[in-house]
C-alpha cells in the first residue's frame, strides 16, 4: 500500500522557459521540471521529485552491491589530511581537493574519494588471509573544487557517489572482485535504463593499472570515446591506444631543405606540398613538470592527448610561451627534430617509429625539411604513446576502423593493487606466515550523475520521459475538473485502487486549465497518465497515456487500475 502525493501540496516549481545557463538537456529539464535548483556554481539542491529518483537509484545500487557480496558502511566526509600525506596524494590531487583547518589548526580535507580513509580503517583489523576478501561500500556526498563547474549535475563541486573498496590476498581474488563489480555495474545501468558502454579507461589520480568505465552514450556527453563495431573494443580518449597509420612525407627520401614562406601551420604546409596532413609531422614545444624544455612530435592530423602527455611529461606540463620559445632558440610554426637546439628533449609518438620520410619544421623561420629520417638525421630521446585516437584509426584488437562517440561517465572500476596499502602500511599474514600488503580494488557509481544520464537519454521536445524504475512517481492521475463531485469520486476510486496495488501515484488536483496540466505533466515525465475528462466520464471511461510512446487509449473506469498496475509492474526492474 502506497500513499498518493497531491500536486496542490507538492513542492515542484516548474519553469516555462529554458534557463539561460543550461547547456545540456538534462540540466535544462531538471531545472524546468522543478527537480533541482542551483545554489552556487556546481552546487545544487535536490527538490522532492529529484530526491525520490535519487533514492531509487541508490536502492538499485545497494541491491546490486549487496548481491555481489559487498557490505555497506558509512565513513566521515571530513578526512584527516595526514592520511592523504601518507598516501602521497595530497599535493598530486591539485586544487580540486578541498582543504581547510579546524579550530585547533589541524588540517582536514573534504573527501572526493575515500581510499585513504578505508585503508586506515582496515589496516589494524584485516590481519590474516583468512579474513579476505572483504568488499566495503558507502553512498555519500563527495566534494571536488572544480575550476569550471558546468553541465548541471554532470560536473559539480558536490555530488553523490557510491564508492566500494575491496581487499584481497591474491591477484586472482582481486580479479574475481573486479569481475563481480563489472557485472554489478552492468546490472545497475540496465535497471536504471541507462544505455552504457564499458570502455577501457585511464586510472587518473586514483591509481592502479587496470580500469573500466561505464559510459552512458549521449551526443552532449563531456567525454570522448572510440569503439569497434566488429570486435567490441571500446576505450575513452584518455586510454585509447593504437598504432596510427601514417603517410610518408613528400620527396625522394633525401633530407631536403625547402623554403616555405609564412607557412607556419600544418594545413598550410600540407597544401604547399600537395600532401595529406597525415604526411606531415606536428612539433609541439613544451615545458615538462620539472620545468625542462621538450619537443613532442605527433602525426600532423592528430592531436597531443593531455592525459597521455601527463604520464610522459608530468602533471603540470604546459606549452611554451613566446618568450620561452625565443629563449630556447625555437621558432613558432617551424619547429622540427633536425638541428634541434641543445638541451631540448625530443619525444615522438610511437606511430612514427617506422616512418622514414618526414616533412617537418627546419628550426628556421620560413623553412621546412622533407625526407627527414629518425636516427639518420636526428636522435629521438623517447618514443611514447602521445596522440588522441580518433574515428577511422585502426582498432588495436582487430585492425578495423574505429568509430567515435560521446558519453557520460556514470561508473568506473579500478584494480588499485598495492598503491595505498604499501604507502599506508596495510598488511596481512599470508598462508605461509609472510607479511604482505593488501591487494585493493575500488569502484564508484555517480548516483547524482546517473540521474542526469537517465534524463539525458530519456527526453523529448515536451520534457523528461522517466523509465518506471527511477521515476519519482509511476503514474499521474489528472482530473480535469477536480471541483466536480463526479470527477472527484472517480479520481479517489482510481487513486485508492492504484495505491492498494503498490503503485506510486501523484494526483494533479490543481485548479488549472487542462493545457497547463498536460504540459506540466509531460515536462515532469511520469511514465503513465490517467486523464479524467468530462466526455470520458459520461461514457464510463478514462484516458490512459503512455508518456514514452505518446499512445492514448480509452479504458473503462473499473478496468483502469488493473491495466495500469500490470503495465507498471511489468516495467519495473
Residue map of PLM features:
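NTP/phosphate- and nucleic-acid-binding module
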Residues: 1-573
